[in-house]
Amino acid sequence: MLPKNLKPFHIKNENLIRIGPKLDGGYVLDKRTIPLTEKIITCGLNDDWEFEKHFLKIKPNCEIIAYDHTVDRQFWIDRFKKDIVHFFLLKKLRLRKIISIFKYYDYNNFFKSGNKHHQLKISNKNIENKEITLNKILHDYDNLILKIDIEGDEYNILKQILDNSKKINFEQKITEKNYPINGLDYKNSHRKNDFILNFQD
């Protein structure tokens, strides 16, 4: 059972808009919140910021702040090597896929123009230059969209999301629920029940 402040509610179709790609990485939002949004906090970046780029076309003065400890220099080196191999194996023949080989240049351009990417892991504790909590990230922010896609760790920070929902004016919360849940023992029913009860009202 979802807590009340995470349950979806009915919105008329004419108030909905899809932002980002048609496939993975795109999300349907209530378009009435777009003019009110001052910042997008993105937790989990990987190599996809199409949602953020599309949003900025609609509201150019919105600030983008991303957190992902996995996207570093080695990430781009490994990605480029893999893409080059695929290219020579004739797996990247479409123009879109060929352009994606040079995604690093798009990353540099996007995060040089006032948008920020912090190489920090979203966690339940603050460790300088390594890990950061949502509580610390959201401390000084309001009127924002919180976008979370951290591959199974979303549940580990769900309590922080709930706590901040009571204090901060979120225009919208976007969370991808990935399975398996990191750190959860599926064979132990007591742990599963404890996990679920932890987030019920």
Where are the regions that the model predicts?
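A Trp-anchored, charged/polar loop motif used as the substrate-binding/catalytic surface
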Residues: 128-136
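N-terminal accessory regions of S-adenosyl-L-methionine
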Residues: 1-21
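Conserved acidic-Pro-Pro-aromatic motif
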Residues: 39-41, 57-65, 73, 78, ...
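SAM cofactor-binding core of SAM-dependent methyltransferases
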Residues: 14-128, 141, 179-181
